[in-house]
């Protein structure tokens, strides 16, 4: 028979060490497989005052020049783009404009060499400086503006404008506490918060001074 059936021809070719034409065509395509990128992210601090910058650093593996998108999500949203160095590292400085809690992530942008990926979220709290005092002695047993009774172990703060129940994170010399707004005040110029005795003790606050506040 002059012509072999396709299946027979393929079997014959394999028996003498040749690859079928279809197999040769498929293997001849030089498809480039993308590798999976890995992005690491580090913040120089996890607490910063509004208006002051922090360093944001990271690395993309495999090394090379890659595009990275940094996203800051919190009271507002900020996006910054950066190109890595040849060794895959990147760095920039970011200055927050509002107080509150942020989650920061780095996204490795998908390109012809790597598939996109994202880093673990890094937490950041931004603060402002706030004048503070404390109250309690002589007032225990009295009601507070947001409901309840002021006692020596009451954890909370008084503020003139924040809604009752608003959670505020305060820092003083490395100590921190998160407490609700429970009362109104202080009605003294230059002061934003009145701390209860229990909050004062928790922070090691002297009585009158400046604290870092997340609101």
Show the residue positions of the predicted features.
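Secreted/periplasmic proteins
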Residues: 2-12, 16-51, 55-59, 64, ...
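Short, ordered, surface-exposed loop/turn motifs in non-cytosolic proteins
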Residues: 63-73
